[in-house]
Amino acid sequence: VGKGYGIFFTCLLYLTIGPLFAIPRCATVSFTTGITPLLGADSPEQLYLLLFSAVFFAFVLFFSLRPGKITVWIGKIINPLFLFFFAVLMLAALLAPGAAVSAVEPVEAYRSDAFFPALIEGYGTMDAIAGLAFGIVVIDVIRRMGVDNDDAIAEDVLSSGLLTGALMALIYVVSIVVGAQSRGLFELSENGGIALTQIAGHYLGGVGLFILAFTITFACLKTSIGLVTACAETFSKMTNGKISYRSWAILFTVFSFAVSNIGLSAIIEYSIPMLMLIYPPAIALILLAFLGKFFAHDRTVYIATMTGTWAAAIFDCMKTLPAPVQAALHLDAPIAFAAAHLPLFDKNLGWLLPAVIGFAAGMAIRASRRQTPAALS
């Protein structure tokens, strides 16, 4: 699209999967699954969250400034241990379900057109935008393994991406089934961390809760260290080293610590407007990259498509802002305008038609430019 846009979008991607949402969420997920079940009903949960997140981010900062064997150890031992424990938990739940999925009454949002709210809920995984941000890391790793041919690199990235996608899809599907079946045992949970804790406690008892807390905390710690490191390195490079890696790492860690103390449910709620803004351009960019060979990656097509996508995504973002913010910014009129003129706006997909129109306009401009020299000759 352009160098300036590339810098802007890269910053937005890394901030979203970094200090704004993903890093704080790692700390709150660890707290929700590991510490909350141990607290009494009258315990000052907010105080315990403050203390836990302070210790959590102290470790994050320490190891982000001293990257070494700890992250390798966590990656090679703790992550596989968590996956093994998760597989045992899911198998136990599937073999003794709390209720049949068909017997569970869906919540209001999923009683009709379940696909659309589920699609938007999928934004919360941040998988697509993380793929854009860290795809270059995968390529660098493959090159360090001695693969220099671009076609071979593309083939390796594709095969590893397909395998990763298939495994992630399997994990998501199994988690959805187990979560639905658990409605026969528990009331609807406020967030997934609470649900996972309840399921682990029911099927595996106190030992299961301890293992879950241990493995998730260390897995989230490794993820946070990796995210702080990646964000700090990226922003240090973008500022040409004028602001050091150390300064960025400290800034991102302190900011993440502050955000984490609003709690997991609040982080999820406040992340929705940002994800509604950033996901449509991310999806459009991915699709354009796949289709680029058909228009020689013409910059005009990219710019036109991105223009249409961003223009509509802003309305989707407005719609999902908290009601007090909408009222303070007097957004009723623009939201009503979008609802009246953008198809699928009520499904949070109002950006689709503008993106298609932008793509068509870009292709038309490209075609007219190619025809003009021929006509003159």
For each predicted feature, which ranges?
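TM-loop-TM module centered on a large, flexible mid-protein loop between adjacent transmembrane helices
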Residues: 1, 171-221, 228, 273
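Select transmembrane alpha-helical segments in multipass membrane proteins
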Residues: 4-17, 50-54, 113-121, 202-219, ...
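Hydrophobic transmembrane alpha-helices that form the core helical bundles
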Residues: 6-40, 220-236
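Hydrophobic, membrane-embedded alpha-helices of multi-pass small-molecule transporters
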Residues: 15-19, 92-99, 108-178, 208-223, ...
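Membrane-water interface regions at transmembrane-helix termini and the short interhelical loops
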Residues: 55-78, 144-147, 257-270, 286-296
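Membrane-interface loop-to-helix entry segments
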Residues: 64-93, 272-283, 302-312
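Hydrophobic, small-residue-rich membrane helices and short re-entrant helix-turn-helix hairpins
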Residues: 66-77, 115-118, 138-167, 185-197, ...
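A generic transmembrane alpha-helix motif of multi-pass inner-membrane proteins
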Residues: 96, 298, 304-377
